[in-house]
Amino acid sequence: MGNEGDDMNGNDMNGSDVRTAFRTCPLCEAGCGLEITVKRGPQGETVTRIRGDMADVFSHGFICPKGSTLKQLHDDPDRVRRPLVKRNGVHEEVEWAEAWAVIADRLPEMMARHGRESVGVYLGNPSAHSLSALLYNRSMLQALGTRRRFSASTVDQMPRQVAAAYVFGTAVSVPVPDLDHTDFLVIMGANPYASNGSLCTAPDFPGRIEAIRARGGTVVVVDPRRSRTAEEADRWLPIRPGTDALLLAAMVTALAVDGLIAPGDHVAPHLQGLDEVVAALAPFTPESVAQATGLAAGEIRSLARDMAAAASGSVYGRIGTTTTGLGNEGFGTVTSWLIDVVNIVTGNLDRRGGAMFTMPVAGAPTTRGKSGTGKGFAIGRGHTVSRQLPEVMGEYPAAAMAEEITRAGDQGIKVMITVAGNPVLSTPNSLQLDEALSELEFMVSVDMYLNETTRHADVILPSPSQLQRGHYDVALLQFAIRNVANYSDPVLPLDDHQPDEWEILAKLGLIAAGLGADAEPALADEVGMRSMVQSSVNDPSSPIHGRDADEIVSALGDEPGPARMLDFMLQTGPFGAAFGANPDGASVALLRANPHGVDFGALQARLPEILRTPSGTIELNHPILMADLVRLHAAMDAAAHQPLVLVGRRHLRSNNSWMHNIEVLVKGKPRCTLHVHPDDAARLGLSDGGVARVTSRVGTVDAAVEVTDSIRPGVVSLPHGWGHGQPGTRMRVAAERAGVNSNILADHTAIDPLSGTSVLNGIPVEIVGVAVAAV
């Protein structure tokens, strides 16, 4: 609860020039609470200290190095604070009215001339960490009316969501490991000591891993790298990249042979196709996959038996399993599905200590509509022009973006809008996309930086800093290990004439709809708000079904913006106040009165109500997933004979291409180095500190070599998100530590056909030493 003398956000307002604000860190998926000291001065308010919020109900004071640098991010002199318009190849500062006028003059006209499908949109990863972007990107996209939507999802988590959608019915029906109660945790392709966790919102993930071991549990890491997480685990299995699905399939077969398939009485009545799945996996034995995976058959059997014998357990996989591939073929979706299969056959789905489902406080597709049944999931409502790649979850593969600009002829993308993204560094065959963006007729970017992507934009619209925005993790709390909620109002006020992020996105949509440069963002907000309310009062499953829509809108107040929409979502969510029906329930008012968050309890069993499949069961044998086993089996022999392959890696002080312009986070020993095992270094004539030329099918980079035994032989590692300092960018610190762009090596044709996700781990490469300085 807020202290006496605090304002509604817990700010100390006792007449001092210093106040304390609380908010959730928006820089990764952990959702840690921050305590922020703000001082008033002649030039306004400034942040003087950021530390972990000891009273936060979820993070209990934990903070990583990134969270403490929100002040440096806000104060960064390279952060764009006024709109930029490109004239004669140079970006110049202009007033907001002029920037809007340029967009209003060009965007509608080009849409009319080329058609709505001439517009492409790319939504970057930070959009998932922004309340405004999550709520108002939708209205912008609707106004644009284009199906050519791309995002970071297809270089990230899309396979995990597709697998969940086929099996459980929605793309957010992703089981998360019950970290605080599990006895046996298998971590595949993830390094939460560096990433803080992903698709598993859990502040202090490292501490929770240590707690598992402290209470007598076991932690196993399956990863070609001996990451920091692997170093802290009980067991490290250095698997060959791209073969995670083979390991999981063989675990199921080993359990079947031992008679240990036991989904449990709580799951079995709701389970479809278990016997069929087990039979289909029978060819994948520990012996048959041993050579391909690089793991002994005995190790595979032991892992399966140990998990089955544990009182509770969970397999958790992340980007190493979703962006995994063998050669030119991605297997992220089938790998994600097999994670669910292993959790199910060991009896660990939907029970304490196993893999459980969150009950999101602000609601989700898993809490709305008729429970226990639904429409299910399908892909392919549209296809790309150049390669006929199917739509997945309303978007096309990011790997197809460049060719949709350059190789689609009259049907190509002519206009691009990017929101909080840097795909020139984060998508496959990056040089191809870099060149393609230069061919656009018009480009608009909503971004805080003039970076490798936005340098191509004709207009850059700067969003306010993270400290100037209200925050609630709508997306990430759908995958939290507890049912928690935490809202924070902006810590600092907007700069003079700076619109809020929601206003920028709403106005872009209004201009696209032909309403001109003077259109008021509040109009889009009101239309969106009324649409949400009307849909809910018409929904028989809604807690406000049958209520008067005008009454509900009136109760929400007349202050436009994301807080009002969030209030509606909270009040109509599973713990909601329901506009008076449950006075003690969730609302923005409740969260403002509790600035350290509200804990609505541990995860509870949700079967069968969480299901939204057409059959009303767990469709474990979904035909699309089953059919992909044929492709997996065909690739098994080739896996054992792969050439040298490249994988990525993360670092605690960065997040993808973010945060590289903050001195305190990038100082010290260079971290954009090529990790090479000593045996490979000797064979290739590489030396520690030397330079290696790394070549894939599509590109070449020169990287500094770091010889280390923390990676298995035959595998090299290069972090992603680097390659800064290109002409036209304005990121001084990042340019001084540019590194190299590993995605130049990623093949844009290598994707997982079920999800459209790129292969970023397991890229075949050739390496030679070079006698030149690394770039």
Predicted regions and their residues:
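Extended redox/cofactor-interaction regions of prokaryotic respiratory oxidoreductases
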Residues: 134-211, 217-222, 246-249, 339-455, ...
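Long, contiguous, secondary-structure-rich segments that constitute the structural scaffold
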Residues: 13, 490-569, 657-675, 679-775
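Active-site phosphate/pyrophosphate-binding segments
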Residues: 251, 270-397
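Acidic/polar loop patches that form or flank catalytic/metal-binding clefts of enzymes
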Residues: 48, 149, 262-264, 300-301, ...
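Short beta-alpha connecting loops at secondary-structure transitions
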Residues: 231-239, 467-474, 483-494, 665
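Hydrophobic alpha-helical scaffolding
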Residues: 70, 89-96, 126-130, 169-175, ...
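Flexible glycine/proline-enriched surface loops and loop-helix/loop-strand junctions
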Residues: 190-191, 232-233, 283-288, 318-326, ...
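N-terminal export/assembly segments and adjacent metallocofactor-ligating motifs
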Residues: 1-259, 296, 391, 419, ...
